[in-house]
Regions:
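Surface-exposed patches in mature extracellular/periplasmic domains of secreted proteins
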Residues: 67-80, 133-138, 185-203
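Substrate-binding clefts and substrate-entry loops adjacent to catalytic sites
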Residues: 101-102, 139-163
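An active-site-proximal "capping" alpha-helix that borders the catalytic cofactor pocket
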Residues: 168-182
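N-terminal Sec-pathway targeting helices
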Residues: 1-10
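Auxiliary, metal-adjacent structural segments of Zn-dependent hydrolase domains
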Residues: 38-95
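Catalytic Zn2+-binding segment of zinc metalloproteases
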Residues: 121-139, 182-184
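Pan-zinc metallopeptidase signature
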Residues: 6, 14-26, 31-32, 183-330
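Short pre-active-site segment immediately N-terminal to the catalytic Zn-binding motif
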Residues: 99-117, 164
Length: 330
């Protein structure tokens, strides 16, 4: 058993290097290349990406908040084809400090890779500042508020795409996307069409605590990296404060340009009725009110209980999440 534990610990400590030996199919022909002032090499292996597009990709990379760790990134490659048999758009190799972007024949502009590039740079960020984040019981894991048993620690010897969202490496990379990554504004006109809620930038793992309101984690990251988290990235979950036949009221952060969609499912033994209500916040209030009077709802007393959740999107960044579902007796 002691021998097994020793081998296990060695493998865990070696993980950042082991994953870097993953092979990728790279065409022999280089179509374009560019070196940034920091010394980052941008290399295209597809005719779809010329030098000008590589320079634009570099500008896209800079939209991700960064510190001196960016100078240690060696290369960003763009391949025309796919990665093995998967449909992934990117990967990061920690030994060579290289980001590889796939499907360059299909995605031909930097904005097409915005979220992917942020996520892969998030891996670079994570291994630079938190080199042991892939280990159980790390300081990051404790402050992140996720139980060790709720995460997968076997990516390097038993990787399974089904558990991608539960590997600590992927959780921290997505944390970076939401707290430091490049953002895009969305139009308020798209609220009623629901498009912004489907297209928002959100954490892949919606079963873990909301990173956008974990202020203790924010302070920890800022202290360790020296990179401040913009106040616009902080979005707290609404709290139900009042419910009656006319309105449903929540307390929220006093911020404007936050779109909310209330998902209200009314249930009894015979039927379910789903109602969606929309509101956009203003800066001068910390109360969110949904009006039930104008909705095509049968008398609430005809139902036994309701299930409610709220979809949230910051219109200035497209970042958001869905709250946990809450059951309310009627």
């Amino acid at each position: 058993m002691i021998r097994f534990n020793q081998i296990f610990i060695i493998l865990l400590l070696s993980f950042p290097f082991l994953i870097s030996f993953e092979t990728t199919d790279i065409d022999d022909k280089t179509f374009a290349s560019f070196q940034s002032p920091e010394g980052i090499n941008f290399t295209s292996y597809t005719p779809s990406w010329d030098e000008d597009r590589l320079k634009d990709l570099y500008k896209e990379l800079l939209l991700n908040k960064h510190g001196q760790e960016i100078s240690e990134l060696n290369e960003v490659r763009i391949l025309g084809g796919t990665h093995s048999s998967t449909n992934t758009k990117g990967s990061y190799h920690s030994l060579t400090k290289t980001i590889v972007l796939y499907q360059g024949n299909q995605y031909e502009t930097p904005v097409d890779y915005r979220e992917t590039l942020s996520h892969e740079y998030g891996h670079h960020f994570a291994y630079h500042y938190f080199p042991t984040h892939h280990l159980p019981f790390s300081e990051w894991q404790r402050i992140r508020g996720i139980d060790v048993a709720d995460m997968r620690w076997d990516a390097f010897w038993n990787y399974d795409e089904r558990y991608h969202a539960f590997y600590p490496q992927e959780i921290l990379a997505d944390d970076y996307v939401l707290l430091y990554g490049a953002t895009s504004e969305v139009e308020s006109e798209d609220v009623m069409s629901n498009e912004i809620f489907y297209m928002r930038t959100q954490h892949e793992n919606q079963d873990i605590p909301n990173v956008l309101e974990n202020k203790k984690l924010h302070s920890f990251l800022e202290e360790k990296t020296g990179l401040a988290i913009d106040s616009s990235r902080i979005i707290e979950s609404p709290s139900l404060i009042e419910w009656n036949d006319q309105t449903i009221r929540f307390s929220v952060s006093s911020r404007d340009h936050i779109a909310y969609r209330l998902n209200l499912e009314l249930i009894n033994q015979n039927e379910n009725q789903l109602v969606e209500l929309y509101e956009v916040s203003s800066h001068d209030t910390n109360t969110l009110t949904f009006n039930l009077q104008d909705q095509d709802i049968i008398n609430l007393t005809d139902y036994d209980y309701a299930l409610i959740s709220i979809d949230i999107v910051d219109l200035t960044t497209s970042i958001g999440f869905e709250t946990d579902e809450t059951r309310v007796s009627l």
